[in-house]
Amino acid sequence: MAEWLLSASWQRRAKAMTAAAGSAGRAAVPLLLCALLAPGGAYVLDDSDGLGREFDGIGAVSGGGATSRLLVNYPEPYRSQILDYLFKPNFGASLHILKVEIGGDGQTTDGTEPSHMHYALDENYFRGYEWWLMKEAKKRNPNITLIGLPWSFPGWLGKGFDWPYVNLQLTAYYVVTWIVGAKRYHDLDIDYIGIWNERSYNANYIKILRKMLNYQGLQRVKIIASDNLWESISASMLLDAELFKVVDVIGAHYPGTHSAKDAKLTGKKLWSSEDFSTLNSDMGAGCWGRILNQNYINGYMTSTIAWNLVASYYEQLPYGRCGLMTAQEPWSGHYVVESPVWVSAHTTQFTQPGWYYLKTVGHLEKGGSYVALTDGLGNLTIIIETMSHKHSKCIRPFLPYFNVSQQFATFVLKGSFSEIPELQVWYTKLGKTSERFLFKQLDSLWLLDSDGSFTLSLHEDELFTLTTLTTGRKGSYPLPPKSQPFPSTYKDDFNVDYPFFSEAPNFADQTGVFEYFTNIEDPGEHHFTLRQVLNQRPITWAADASNTISIIGDYNWTNLTIKCDVYIETPDTGGVFIAGRVNKGGILIRSARGIFFWIFANGSYRVTGDLAGWIIYALGRVEVTAKKWYTLTLTIKGHFTSGMLNDKSLWTDIPVNFPKNGWAAIGTHSFEFAQFDNFLVEATR
């Protein structure tokens, strides 16, 4: 057994770490200098034979869709605090990459994001919130990498087809205008552009996109393809020299830490360009910690990008709380810095794009993995994870069983790292509250007399970072306000002369796009309104409804009264609705149930139990035409509903048994222009 070295200083460190462990019961968090106390694996970290692949960074996706919707109207200082936890270097997640949806007006998981070109002759580079988010990220980290990717496309590009490749030049033009607009209007340099999220790629389109980028002087913008599976795009690149030349990065989604043979044969950069998508509990954190290491070890992926950045959408929408952190209550200011933020920090705070992986990375003998990266200037960062199968399952793909057990692991630094005198140590333990630590700095590890080796005692569900960098920090702010339900009384008159964002607070568009509108034809009460602005179905990514709809409020609302002024713009065929107890949204919006109160320009009304209009509770004639304002009131109490038009009762006490609760909503009968004003909801759970 090797002699104890620096025993006095080690004893002091052991006492400190035992105290830090507290009720965890571990007799000192497990750093043993050259103490081979038990059999275990030995792992050499060496750059003598060169380095591995270049590291491109860790990031997250905003969009795909509307995942940051509720973030924008958080009050200060909480909004800035959330952004700091995500983007500020050496503070929280400290992300290297921000990938955003190029809004295309379609439903793309949890809502729609507006296009910068709703129509062929329409250009507006201030819609939505992704521009704002990219600028906020750049404020905090000027070196952050920016990526744009379309999910859906505005309908005019399809010329009557649900397909973006009808006119390749036109679609390329549309995408390039977004990149040019980002620079012209926001001084944002987009670094990478994608093709069509998780849908078909077109090789000729990719080539045309490259030519158009070059023509616009955007040679620096690189192309990622195809944000889907490895196989097809990799095989196409191997068979098509021109396609091979224009694709810079092969990006795959949810690869399960493995890449395809053809992808590796290309020699191109390989990215997990969307991954994670898991509830941000400690299991989600375990998933994230495992794949951040093993995506490179198993699949040579040099970047991993989480969907999604921050869970800022109503939690009952699909994939609730599948963000690195949670910020879904702008009305209260409450947010939660979830454990995936600190798992991210183990890598992001101690590496940068442009560093290189060592060739000597791999799996631990008794489960877990290790990677090491260097900047080539003497700095070294080692990340070790021992995430158990039970606590590291991602939402997909299926994870084959593996075992992780307690072990001793000896690491030997060789090559240019053999003379490193000291390593900073950061530690995370996931699991029971009594044993849990998140990104805790331990005493540094001295290597002066150890021949560059050290031994760790590793248990399951742990994460270690050992690094020469001294800049790491666990940032913090005072606790945000306590969680509160959505206000039971909520009103909005939309009287905003110069709105900072194009969408009204808390409304979450699920099909169609609802924007602030200045009604120049009405200088009076309805001068400022909320308008549904799409008159054509977009090129869809999901199963958008046939009707447009925007939801708002508390999913647990049971008894409520909704009142809203409405204005149908389309004669004869136009129609609008208000609704309560809407029980579905996102990619499930077509099958939403609820109580929907419709009026139509043809002089009729209808009460339905679903958005599609198949379940009819009541219908009749009413004095309604287009181009005139009306006030609708819908009251739902217990098992009964009543409705009024301009304060005149249309029906009373119609029995409704399902659903029991849900959001409030507004919308239109089809993709048509319509306006809404003086929205009011009064509700109880």
Curated annotation (Swiss-Prot):
Changing T668R: In KRB; infantile; significant reduction of activity. One of its GO terms (molecular function) is galactosylceramidase activity. It is an enzyme of class 3 (hydrolase). Substrate binds at T109, W151, N197, R396. Changing R531H: In KRB; infantile; significant reduction of activity. GO terms for biological process: galactosylceramide catabolic process; glycosphingolipid catabolic process; myelination. Changing Y335C: In KRB; infantile; significant reduction of activity. Disulfide bonds join C287-C394. The active site is at E198 (proton donor/acceptor), E274 (nucleophile). Detected in urine. Detected in testis, brain and placenta (at protein level). Detected in kidney and liver. Activity is lost after heating at 52 degrees Celsius for five minutes. Changing D544N: In KRB; Arab patients. Its main location: other. GO terms for cellular component: lysosomal lumen; lysosome; membrane. Keywords: Disease variant, Disulfide bond, Glycoprotein, Glycosidase, Hydrolase, Leukodystrophy, Lipid degradation, Lipid metabolism, Lysosome, Signal, Sphingolipid metabolism. Changing I305V: Reduction of activity. Glycans are attached at N143, N379, N403, N556, N559, N602. Changing I250T: In KRB; late infantile. It catalyses: a beta-D-galactosyl-(1<->1')-N-acylsphing-4-enine + H2O = an N-acylsphing-4-enine + D-galactose; beta-D-galactosyl-(1<->1)-sphing-4-enine + H2O = sphing-4-enine + D-galactose; a D-galactosylceramide + H2O = an N-acyl-sphingoid base + D-galactose. Optimum pH is 4.0-4.4. InterPro entries: Aldolase_TIM, GH59_C, GH59_cat, Glyco_hydro_59, Glyco_hydro_59_dom, Glycoside_hydrolase_SF. Residues 1-42 form the signal peptide. It is linked to Krabbe disease: An autosomal recessive disorder characterized by insufficient catabolism of several galactolipids that are important for normal myelin production. Four clinical forms are recognized. The infantile form accounts for 90% of cases. It manifests before six months of age with irritability, spasticity, arrest of motor and mental development, and bouts of temperature elevation without infection. This is Galactocerebrosidase. It comes from Homo sapiens. The lineage of its organism: Eukaryota, Metazoa, Chordata, Craniata, Vertebrata.
